[in-house]
């Protein structure tokens, strides 16, 4: 299949949709298991004093039986990723061709399906859920990308899906409007 083109005047959103929607990366296992100290530091930073996240003795007496990870998509992604060192570039999604290269993160939502416990070993796979064109005042040919990070535990049970909606747009110069906007008025 020919690679979709994103050059001015030749962008084919339907071709891009056919090629990229449903694209999924291989599952990547996180470098480290879920650790209590990282959870504790996060809770102190955000002033979350829930004993299920902080007190291992208390957590043992509860139905969960262990300290839980707070429902934070970023914490889940941290534990499912390659960790802080050595630094490894992990793109949030495959590079979808678009007419513009400017990116705005429009929204993020997390859908939880299971609890994350200290000691769990998380993994992540990423997929493109949707690509569509929707005009905005910045660019009538803006492209929207919905990318998902699917987090699973060591039993391959899905614990959450982190869904990011991003808008890509062209600059006024890329749209051919740069000359008009610079005219004295």
Functional labels for PLM-detected ranges:
Residues 2-107, 173-178:
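Hot-dog-fold acyl-thioester-processing enzymes
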